[in-house]
Design a protein with these regions (language model features):
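N-terminal cap/lid segment of alpha/beta-hydrolase-fold proteins
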Residues: 1-21, 151-152
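Mobile cap/lid helix-loop segments that gate and shape the active-site cleft of serine hydrolases
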Residues: 5, 142-177
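Short beta-strand element of the alpha/beta-hydrolase
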Residues: 24-32
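Catalytic nucleophile-loop/oxyanion-hole region of alpha/beta-hydrolase
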Residues: 39-40, 45, 58-94, 233-238
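Primarily recognizes the serine-hydrolase "nucleophile elbow" in alpha/beta-hydrolase
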Residues: 78-152, 169
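Short beta-strand/loop motif that positions the catalytic acidic residue
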Residues: 181, 187-189, 193
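Conserved alpha/beta-hydrolase "acid-adjacent" motif
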Residues: 194-203
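C-terminal catalytic histidine-bearing segment of alpha/beta-hydrolase fold enzymes
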Residues: 202-256
Length: 256
Protein backbone atom coordinates (compact mmCIF):
# COMPACT_ATOMS: atom_id res chain seq x y z
CA UNK A 1 0.00 0.00 0.00
CA UNK A 2 1.19 3.51 -0.75
CA UNK A 3 1.49 5.91 2.18
CA UNK A 4 1.21 9.03 0.06
CA UNK A 5 -1.50 9.73 -2.49
CA UNK A 6 0.68 11.60 -4.98
CA UNK A 7 3.32 10.48 -7.43
CA UNK A 8 6.09 12.42 -5.71
CA UNK A 9 6.23 10.04 -2.73
CA UNK A 10 6.26 6.30 -3.42
CA UNK A 11 6.70 5.01 0.13
CA UNK A 12 5.12 1.58 0.66
CA UNK A 13 3.76 0.08 3.86
CA UNK A 14 3.11 -3.67 4.02
CA UNK A 15 0.74 -5.30 6.51
CA UNK A 16 1.61 -8.65 8.11
CA UNK A 17 -1.44 -10.15 9.78
CA UNK A 18 -0.87 -12.09 12.97
CA UNK A 19 -1.49 -15.81 13.13
CA UNK A 20 -3.69 -16.73 16.11
CA UNK A 21 -3.90 -13.06 17.07
CA UNK A 22 -3.54 -12.48 20.81
CA UNK A 23 -2.83 -8.75 20.94
CA UNK A 24 -4.52 -5.52 19.94
CA UNK A 25 -1.13 -3.82 19.51
CA UNK A 26 0.72 -3.15 16.27
CA UNK A 27 4.42 -2.85 15.50
CA UNK A 28 5.56 -0.46 12.76
CA UNK A 29 8.95 -1.63 11.50
CA UNK A 30 11.72 0.45 9.88
CA UNK A 31 14.49 -1.81 8.48
CA UNK A 32 18.13 -0.79 8.80
CA UNK A 33 20.61 -0.02 6.05
CA UNK A 34 22.58 3.16 6.91
CA UNK A 35 19.87 5.32 5.26
CA UNK A 36 21.22 3.94 1.97
CA UNK A 37 19.07 0.80 1.62
CA UNK A 38 16.59 -1.29 3.62
CA UNK A 39 17.58 -4.76 4.83
CA UNK A 40 14.85 -7.36 4.28
CA UNK A 41 15.83 -9.49 7.28
CA UNK A 42 15.24 -6.46 9.52
CA UNK A 43 11.82 -5.86 7.99
CA UNK A 44 10.03 -8.94 6.73
CA UNK A 45 12.15 -11.09 9.07
CA UNK A 46 10.83 -9.25 12.12
CA UNK A 47 7.27 -9.16 10.77
CA UNK A 48 7.26 -12.94 10.43
CA UNK A 49 8.38 -13.23 14.06
CA UNK A 50 5.49 -11.01 15.18
CA UNK A 51 3.08 -13.07 13.08
CA UNK A 52 4.24 -16.16 14.96
CA UNK A 53 3.49 -14.64 18.39
CA UNK A 54 0.08 -13.26 17.43
CA UNK A 55 0.92 -9.57 16.91
CA UNK A 56 0.07 -7.51 13.83
CA UNK A 57 2.90 -5.57 12.21
CA UNK A 58 3.69 -3.27 9.29
CA UNK A 59 6.96 -2.85 7.38
CA UNK A 60 7.75 0.59 5.95
CA UNK A 61 9.93 1.09 2.87
CA UNK A 62 10.87 4.64 3.83
CA UNK A 63 12.96 6.93 1.63
CA UNK A 64 16.76 6.71 1.82
CA UNK A 65 19.62 8.73 0.29
CA UNK A 66 19.58 10.74 -1.90
CA UNK A 67 16.15 11.56 -0.42
CA UNK A 68 17.52 13.35 2.63
CA UNK A 69 16.03 14.67 5.87
CA UNK A 70 13.23 15.34 6.50
CA UNK A 71 11.80 12.82 4.01
CA UNK A 72 12.55 9.64 6.03
CA UNK A 73 11.01 11.25 9.12
CA UNK A 74 7.99 12.40 7.13
CA UNK A 75 7.55 8.79 5.97
CA UNK A 76 7.84 7.50 9.55
CA UNK A 77 5.29 9.98 10.87
CA UNK A 78 2.98 9.15 8.00
CA UNK A 79 3.25 5.43 8.74
CA UNK A 80 2.18 5.82 12.37
CA UNK A 81 -0.65 8.14 11.32
CA UNK A 82 -1.82 5.60 8.74
CA UNK A 83 -1.88 2.74 11.25
CA UNK A 84 -3.63 4.85 13.90
CA UNK A 85 -6.22 6.16 11.43
CA UNK A 86 -6.95 2.59 10.28
CA UNK A 87 -6.86 1.00 13.73
CA UNK A 88 -10.43 -0.29 13.60
CA UNK A 89 -9.88 -1.87 10.18
CA UNK A 90 -6.86 -3.84 11.43
CA UNK A 91 -8.20 -4.64 14.91
CA UNK A 92 -5.65 -2.40 16.62
CA UNK A 93 -5.83 -0.26 19.73
CA UNK A 94 -4.73 3.20 18.48
CA UNK A 95 -2.91 3.74 21.79
CA UNK A 96 -0.84 0.56 21.40
CA UNK A 97 1.35 1.38 18.41
CA UNK A 98 5.06 0.64 18.76
CA UNK A 99 7.78 1.62 16.31
CA UNK A 100 10.77 -0.62 15.78
CA UNK A 101 14.06 -0.35 13.94
CA UNK A 102 17.55 -1.75 13.58
CA UNK A 103 20.76 0.21 13.03
CA UNK A 104 19.78 3.30 10.96
CA UNK A 105 16.17 2.11 11.16
CA UNK A 106 16.67 2.27 14.92
CA UNK A 107 17.80 5.86 14.55
CA UNK A 108 14.64 6.64 12.58
CA UNK A 109 12.61 4.93 15.31
CA UNK A 110 14.28 6.95 18.07
CA UNK A 111 14.15 10.19 16.05
CA UNK A 112 10.42 9.71 15.48
CA UNK A 113 10.06 9.17 19.24
CA UNK A 114 11.97 12.34 20.21
CA UNK A 115 11.84 14.92 17.38
CA UNK A 116 8.52 16.73 17.57
CA UNK A 117 9.09 19.95 15.61
CA UNK A 118 6.73 20.65 12.68
CA UNK A 119 8.18 19.68 9.30
CA UNK A 120 7.56 21.24 5.93
CA UNK A 121 5.71 18.68 3.85
CA UNK A 122 3.09 17.80 6.45
CA UNK A 123 -0.50 19.08 6.37
CA UNK A 124 -1.12 17.66 2.90
CA UNK A 125 -4.40 15.94 3.80
CA UNK A 126 -6.70 14.82 6.61
CA UNK A 127 -4.32 12.05 7.68
CA UNK A 128 -1.81 14.64 8.86
CA UNK A 129 -4.26 15.68 11.58
CA UNK A 130 -3.77 12.28 13.26
CA UNK A 131 -1.07 12.00 15.95
CA UNK A 132 2.26 10.56 14.78
CA UNK A 133 3.47 9.83 18.32
CA UNK A 134 4.19 6.15 18.96
CA UNK A 135 3.29 4.58 22.28
CA UNK A 136 6.46 2.50 22.54
CA UNK A 137 9.78 2.06 20.76
CA UNK A 138 11.86 -1.05 20.11
CA UNK A 139 15.52 -0.49 19.24
CA UNK A 140 17.84 -3.16 17.85
CA UNK A 141 21.54 -2.15 17.74
CA UNK A 142 20.41 1.37 16.89
CA UNK A 143 22.43 4.30 15.63
CA UNK A 144 21.85 7.08 18.17
CA UNK A 145 24.79 9.41 18.82
CA UNK A 146 25.97 12.28 16.64
CA UNK A 147 29.43 12.20 15.00
CA UNK A 148 31.05 14.57 17.53
CA UNK A 149 30.73 11.88 20.20
CA UNK A 150 33.27 9.60 18.52
CA UNK A 151 30.93 6.60 18.76
CA UNK A 152 28.59 7.47 15.90
CA UNK A 153 27.93 5.69 12.63
CA UNK A 154 28.92 8.69 10.56
CA UNK A 155 27.73 7.21 7.27
CA UNK A 156 24.16 6.98 8.52
CA UNK A 157 24.14 10.63 9.54
CA UNK A 158 25.63 11.72 6.21
CA UNK A 159 23.10 9.64 4.26
CA UNK A 160 20.27 11.07 6.34
CA UNK A 161 21.29 14.73 6.28
CA UNK A 162 23.21 15.31 3.05
CA UNK A 163 24.18 18.99 2.88
CA UNK A 164 22.52 19.57 6.27
CA UNK A 165 25.06 17.27 7.97
CA UNK A 166 27.12 19.94 9.76
CA UNK A 167 24.14 22.09 10.71
CA UNK A 168 21.79 19.35 11.93
CA UNK A 169 23.65 16.29 13.21
CA UNK A 170 23.17 17.23 16.88
CA UNK A 171 19.54 18.22 16.32
CA UNK A 172 18.69 14.63 15.32
CA UNK A 173 20.66 12.90 18.10
CA UNK A 174 17.88 11.20 20.11
CA UNK A 175 20.02 11.06 23.27
CA UNK A 176 20.16 14.87 23.24
CA UNK A 177 16.50 15.55 22.48
CA UNK A 178 14.66 12.91 24.53
CA UNK A 179 12.05 14.32 26.89
CA UNK A 180 9.43 13.10 29.38
CA UNK A 181 7.05 12.79 26.38
CA UNK A 182 9.29 10.16 24.76
CA UNK A 183 7.60 6.72 24.73
CA UNK A 184 8.73 3.72 26.74
CA UNK A 185 11.51 1.66 25.20
CA UNK A 186 12.88 -1.85 24.74
CA UNK A 187 16.55 -1.76 23.68
CA UNK A 188 19.02 -4.48 22.80
CA UNK A 189 22.57 -4.47 21.44
CA UNK A 190 25.72 -6.58 21.48
CA UNK A 191 28.90 -5.46 23.22
CA UNK A 192 30.97 -6.86 20.34
CA UNK A 193 29.16 -4.82 17.66
CA UNK A 194 31.89 -3.16 15.57
CA UNK A 195 29.43 -1.43 13.25
CA UNK A 196 27.50 0.61 15.82
CA UNK A 197 29.18 1.04 19.20
CA UNK A 198 27.13 -0.35 22.08
CA UNK A 199 27.59 2.94 23.94
CA UNK A 200 24.89 4.30 21.62
CA UNK A 201 22.45 2.06 23.48
CA UNK A 202 23.81 2.92 26.93
CA UNK A 203 23.66 6.66 26.23
CA UNK A 204 20.09 6.54 24.96
CA UNK A 205 18.92 4.40 27.87
CA UNK A 206 20.58 6.83 30.30
CA UNK A 207 18.92 9.78 28.59
CA UNK A 208 15.51 8.10 28.83
CA UNK A 209 16.11 7.31 32.50
CA UNK A 210 16.96 10.96 33.22
CA UNK A 211 13.66 11.93 31.57
CA UNK A 212 11.68 9.44 33.64
CA UNK A 213 10.86 7.26 30.64
CA UNK A 214 10.54 3.50 31.34
CA UNK A 215 13.24 1.50 29.57
CA UNK A 216 14.29 -2.15 29.44
CA UNK A 217 17.71 -2.90 27.94
CA UNK A 218 19.64 -6.09 27.18
CA UNK A 219 23.29 -6.22 26.10
CA UNK A 220 24.76 -9.52 24.90
CA UNK A 221 28.54 -10.06 25.07
CA UNK A 222 29.05 -11.46 21.57
CA UNK A 223 27.56 -11.02 18.11
CA UNK A 224 28.28 -8.90 15.06
CA UNK A 225 26.27 -5.97 13.77
CA UNK A 226 23.08 -6.56 11.80
CA UNK A 227 21.97 -9.87 13.32
CA UNK A 228 18.22 -9.43 12.96
CA UNK A 229 16.49 -12.29 14.78
CA UNK A 230 19.98 -13.84 15.11
CA UNK A 231 19.29 -17.42 13.99
CA UNK A 232 22.99 -18.32 14.04
CA UNK A 233 23.67 -16.80 17.47
CA UNK A 234 21.50 -18.73 19.96
CA UNK A 235 22.55 -16.64 22.96
CA UNK A 236 21.67 -13.37 21.21
CA UNK A 237 18.48 -14.88 19.76
CA UNK A 238 17.03 -14.75 23.27
CA UNK A 239 16.13 -11.13 22.55
CA UNK A 240 12.95 -12.15 20.73
CA UNK A 241 11.68 -14.02 23.78
CA UNK A 242 12.64 -11.12 26.02
CA UNK A 243 10.73 -8.77 23.74
CA UNK A 244 7.66 -11.02 23.86
CA UNK A 245 7.88 -11.02 27.67
CA UNK A 246 8.16 -7.22 27.67
CA UNK A 247 5.06 -6.85 25.50
CA UNK A 248 3.21 -9.02 28.01
CA UNK A 249 4.65 -7.01 30.92
CA UNK A 250 3.39 -3.68 29.55
CA UNK A 251 -0.02 -5.21 28.86
CA UNK A 252 0.21 -5.26 25.08
CA UNK A 253 0.03 -9.02 24.59
CA UNK A 254 -1.87 -11.83 26.25
CA UNK A 255 0.28 -14.48 27.88
CA UNK A 256 0.38 -17.75 25.95
Amino acid sequence: MKLWQNNEHDTEITFYEAKNKCSDAAIVIFPGGAYAMRAEHEGKGYAEFFQSIGVNSFVVDYHVAPDYFPQPLLDARRAVRFVRANAEKYGINPEKIAVMGSSAGGHLTAMLSTYYAPIEGEDVDELDKVSFMPNAQILCYAVIRNPDTGISHEGSFRNLLGEKYDAMNKAVDPALIASPKTPQAFIWHTAADDGVNVINAYDYAASLKRCGVPVEMHVFPDGRHGLGVAPDFPHVAQWTGLLKNWLEYIGWKNEE
